[in-house]
Each structure stands twice: as C-alpha cells, then as structure tokens.
UniProtKB/Swiss-Prot annotation:
The gene is gatB. It comes from Borrelia recurrentis (strain A1). Heterotrimer of A, B and C subunits. Its EC number is 6.3.5.-. Keywords: ATP-binding, Ligase, Nucleotide-binding, Protein biosynthesis. It holds the Pfam family GatB_N. InterPro entries: Asn/Gln-tRNA_amidoTrfase_suB/E, Asn/Gln-tRNA_Trfase_suB/E_cat, Asn/Gln_amidotransferase, Asn/Gln_tRNA_amidoTrase-B-like, GatB, GatB_Yqey_C_2, Gln-tRNA_amidoTrfase_suB_CS, Gln_synth/guanido_kin_cat_dom. It comes from the Bacteria. The keyword Nucleotide-binding applies. Allows the formation of correctly charged Asn-tRNA(Asn) or Gln-tRNA(Gln) through the transamidation of misacylated Asp-tRNA(Asn) or Glu-tRNA(Gln) in organisms which lack either or both of asparaginyl-tRNA or glutaminyl-tRNA synthetases. The reaction takes place in the presence of glutamine and ATP through an activated phospho-Asp-tRNA(Asn) or phospho-Glu-tRNA(Gln). This is Aspartyl/glutamyl-tRNA(Asn/Gln) amidotransferase subunit B. GO terms for biological process: glutaminyl-tRNAGln biosynthesis via transamidation; translation. GO terms for molecular function: asparaginyl-tRNA synthase (glutamine-hydrolyzing) activity; ATP binding; glutaminyl-tRNA synthase (glutamine-hydrolyzing) activity.
Length: 485
C-alpha cells in the first residue's frame, strides 16, 4: 500500500499586547480569577467592542514575516458556538476574508530544507478557561480573565509529511513570533497552542483515496504533537485495511490525545462551517488599511528572522549548523556573539566560547543573555589573548569566571595577578635544558618509546615556571631538544 501523510497545523498564538482584542482590560496571564473583565469581554447587553490597533499591526507584521499577502480591508465575523467559557455565545473572528493569506516559511529537518505553505492568518479573541474539580459534587468553575485575549491563528496547508516536519514547523513559527516580540509562545501558559489535522492519501491501482481527517486538539507539547501524529498514522493505516472508510463517507472527527496511554481518543464529530453560523459582526465596521501603513510596519518593526540569520552566520563566519541553530535560538544571543566577534580574529572560536562557557553560566544562574552583565567585547578580547599566546587555555577559564564575578575585563585580571603566559623562546629553552639535565632517566625512557616520559618532563617545565610558559611552544622546544640528545 502506497500512501503519504497529509498534515496541516492550526496554531493559536496569544499576543503579548497590553490590552485585550476588543476592550481595554489588561491582557495578562494568571492572577485572581475574573479580576480582568468588563461588560465587553463578558458579553453583557449593550456593551460595544472596539478593535485594538495593536492587534491589527501585529497581524500585519506576522504576515510580512510569513511572506503572506495582506488584505487592505479588514472584516470581523461572529463565529457562533455554545460553550460555557464563551460568554457572548459567539467568538469574534475572521471567516472568509482573513487579514493574511497565501504565505510560506521554510523549515529544516534531517531530509533538508522544505517550504511549508500557509493558507491563512486571521485575528480572533480567546475564550475563558473552564476549571473542572474532581470532587464529590463535580463542580466546574469559569475564569473569564482570558476571554477576549488577542489571538492570531496560523493555518498551514497540508504540506507536512511527518511528525519531525510538524515539530520543525512549530519551532520555526515559535522562533518567528519570539523574534518579532509578538508573544512568549509558551505552551505551558497557553500562549502557543496547536491542533493537528491529519489523514492519509492512499494510492491503490493508480486510484487515490483519502482517509477521514482527524483533528487532534489540546496538544500540550511538541513531543505530544509528534507522538499523536505517529499514532494516528499507524491507526489510520490499520483502519483503512479493515474498513476502507474514506473522507467523503465519514468526514472529519475531533480527537483528544491521552498522554499517558499515547493514543488519540474520539471526542465528537467535527462541526462544519455552516454549524458555526458565521455572520459579519455588525458592531465592528470594516477597516481600510492604506498601503503606506502596511509597508511602514514592515520597515519599522521587521527584523532578521532565524532562518535568514542562520544562512548569513554560516556564510559570514563559517559557523557549523549546530553553532548557528543554538545562537539563533535567541536573537539577543546573535547580537552578543556578533559584538564579541568584532574584537577577535577568530569568530568561530568566539562562538565556541559563548556556546560553552557563557551558556554554562547562564544555565547555572537561570538567566538569559540580556541579564548577563559582562560586555561582549570582553569575551572577544579573552579569546584573542588565548589565540596570541598571552594566556593559556586552562587559565583562561579561571580568568573568565572571575571576569563574570567582578564584571571586569580579562586584561585587568591578567595584570593584577601577573598571569600573562611566557612565550620567550630563549627563556623556555633554558628551562627545557635544566629539566633535561635533571632527568637523564626520563631521556632514556623516551628513547625506549615511553610516551609518559615526555608528559613527565612537560610537567617539570610547568612546575618550574608556575604554569606560565606557553605549553605548545614548550612542547615544541622539548621535542627538538630530545631529538638532539
């Protein structure tokens, strides 16, 4: 049986705006239940919404970042459904005229680079949050603090073919929204949520069949996304062999994912567009977006995005795939690296130092690069001192930790503690001769092929100089002298 997976993702991103989408209530996470509500987000009679301008500008920026076509006319619609946490009985959303459409982004997986097309990006408001208590009376509570929070929904085309590609796509989207400072994109607090639509395209005897679509909701981690996709792929293959049900005969079902069992569970048959009874929202007028306004947002708020940054960093500095992926995980880390690289002749060495020593300190202190007070130029200078032999690689790590603790440059510590490495050839040669004269047995062992004899003599050289001589140069001079003995 020949088949391919058809996977489309619906991603909801809660924007980090100061206020909600259609009222002036604060848009914060958590807090006392129902403490950030008003007649508008509670849907009380007579309360009229107004559009948050930042919601529109954020959608435009997201459209630019995803290479989308941006509409000049903004229309809002009412999407009707009866959930307890939807106080108005409808959600303000966009139906047939999303603000952005026909976009794309690139992802990178083990198979290489791939383009994923984006069908649409539309604006909408969030619902409240239901809290179910497993007590004797089985009570449920509703917190409306989240009701009306500003959302963007990004809907991909079914171009994704595996769980690996799905996770890569989600990572790419999350990086874009974080780079643009539009959202924290945290699955833990619900500001980044994903639904998976998945079915199979099966070819039998040159005839194509599509299996019923499963929409898997409430996936709370990238790991769950991959596991759910892998399970559905296996399940749909088995069901096709047993029942041969097609998309035309069954349609679409809404599924949940049981993390503990690793299986998808049927929740309900999926509503169709007509079930939502979309109508244009009569309380919100059409908004005309001038072309200059759309372009102005791009010119003033657009930044270099991660995919482009990785290509540039590799071409400009010769960094590895691992280096650029790690550096571009945070746009501020990229900035820190490039500032440090300005003061060193070896940018790759600077990158290695940041990705090992600097990130180690950040992880230990549980802080981000913005909270790291040591100027980037100090890192570049430290690396340069190692390269030119001013200090040894071993002592450099001790110097770095003191730099971090005291927030001073490496040269300050080197001068204070007289740590500068000795690279004077004549001085080192005199020490080597001393060690050779004092250790004739080690010379004999070396002649017999015992490599540990060289290590012993190098140790003696370092002991005599308190570890301050250049070890590479010392080893070179020692080996030359041993050849002459």
């Amino acid at each position: 049986m020949e088949y391919k997976l058809l996977i489309g993702l619906e991603v909801h991103v809660q924007l980090g705006l100061k206020t909600k989408a259609f009222c002036g209530c604060k848009n914060d996470f958590g807090g006392i239940p129902n403490s950030r509500v008003c007649p508008i987000c509670l849907g009380l009679p007579g309360a009229l919404p107004s559009v948050n301008k930042e919601l529109v500008s954020s959608a435009i920026l997201a459209g630019h970042a995803t290479n989308s076509t941006i509409r000049n006319i903004v229309k809002f619609d009412r999407k009707h459904y009866a959930y307890p946490d939807l106080p108005k009985g409808y959600q303000i959303s966009q139906n047939d005229a999303p603000i952005c459409e026909n976009g794309f982004i690139f992802i990178k997986t083990s198979l290489g680079v791939k383009r994923i097309n984006i069908a649409r990006i539309h604006m909408e408001e969030d619902s409240g949050k239901s809290l179910h208590l497993l007590s004797n009376d089985n009570q449920s509570y509703i917190d409306f603090n989240r009701a009306g929070a500003p959302l963007l929904e990004i809907v991909s085309q079914p171009d994704i073919r595996s769980g690996e590609e799905a996770v890569a796509y989600l990572n790419a989207l999350r990086e874009i929204f974080r780079y643009l400072d539009l959202s924290e994109c945290s699955m833990e607090n619900g500001s980044f949520r994903c639904d998976v639509n998945i079915n199979l395209l099966i070819n039998e005897n040159d005839v194509n069949y599509k299996t019923p679509i499963s929409e898997i909701k409430n996936l709370n981690s990238f790991k769950s996304v991959k596991l759910a996709i892998d399970y559905e792929e296996s399940k749909q293959k088995e069901e096709w062999i047993l029942y041969r049900k097609t998309l035309e005969s069954v349609g679409k079902c809404t599924m949940g994912f049981d993390d503990k069992k690793g299986i998808t569970v049927l929740q309900r048959s999926k509503e169709t567009i007509s079930d939502y009874r979309y109508i244009k929202d009569p309380d919100l007028p059409l908004i005309k977006l001038e072309s200059d306004y759309i372009e102005n947002i791009k010119s003033h708020r657009m930044v270099e995005l991660p995919f482009d940054a990785r290509i540039r960093l590799q071409e400009q500095y010769g960094l590895s795939d691992f280096d650029v992926v790690t550096l571009t995980s945070d746009k501020n880390l990229v900035k820190y690296f490039e500032e440090a690289a300005l003061t060193s002749s070896e940018p790759k060495k600077v990158a290695n130092w940041i990705l090992s020593e600097v990130l180690s300190v950040l992880n230990e202190r549980e802080i981000g690069i913005l909270d790291f007070n040591l100027p980037a130029s100090y890192i570049g200078e430290l690396v340069e001192f190692i390269l030119n032999g001013k200090i040894s690689g071993k002592i450099s790590k001790e110097i770095f930790l003191e730099m971090v603790d005291r927030n001073v440059s490496s040269i300050t510590i080197i001068n204070e503690k007289k740590l500068e490495q000795i690279s004077d050839k004549s001085f080192i040669e005199s020490i080597v001769i001393e060690v050779l004269n004092e250790n004739p047995k080690s010379i004999e062992l070396y002649k017999k092929g015992k490599s540990h004899a060289v290590k012993f003599m190098m140790g003696q050289i370092m002991r005599k100089t308190s570890g301050k001589v250049n070890p590479v140069l010392s080893n070179e001079i020692l080996m030359n002298k041993l050849q002459d003995v």
